[in-house]
UniProtKB/Swiss-Prot annotation:
UniProt gene name: TPTE2P1
Full protein name: Putative phosphatidylinositol 3,4,5-trisphosphate 3-phosphatase TPTE2P1
InterPro entries from the UniProt entry: C2_domain_sf, Tensin_C2-dom
Taxonomic superkingdom: Eukaryota
Disulfide cross-links: none
Annotated source species: Homo sapiens
Amino acid sequence: MPAAFPCVFPPQSLQVFPQMIVKVWEKQSLPLPGLRGSPVERLYLPRNELDNPHKQKAWKIYPPEFAVEILFGMVSVDSLLFVLSSPHWWLHLAQGSFWMSEGGFSLCHPGWSVVAQSLLTSTSAFCVRAILLPQPPE
């Protein structure tokens, strides 16, 4: 099981945008973990593949066509573009927080309780372990 990080946001990070586009790697001292040549440039997760312990409750909120899409791309040798969006106009993703270190990254989004660390290598590409969506009320 990968390490998990709590999501904590300062008040200024709650501005709403239809998608989130952030450079997550700009560090000259470490080489960017290999994305070039990776078979994965896009990760599309339909509703039935999202890991959620409250699926029956969540499915009442999220329609059958709900999905999360994550796009990856290199901007330059030392920066990586990460885009998180949804094809649904009613789902607006707010600005999140990113942490990246040698060999891994994690991200958070307002409303998510926790995210798991994900390794970035040329062989595994992004292994997104879990994105925990906002949970419906009990």
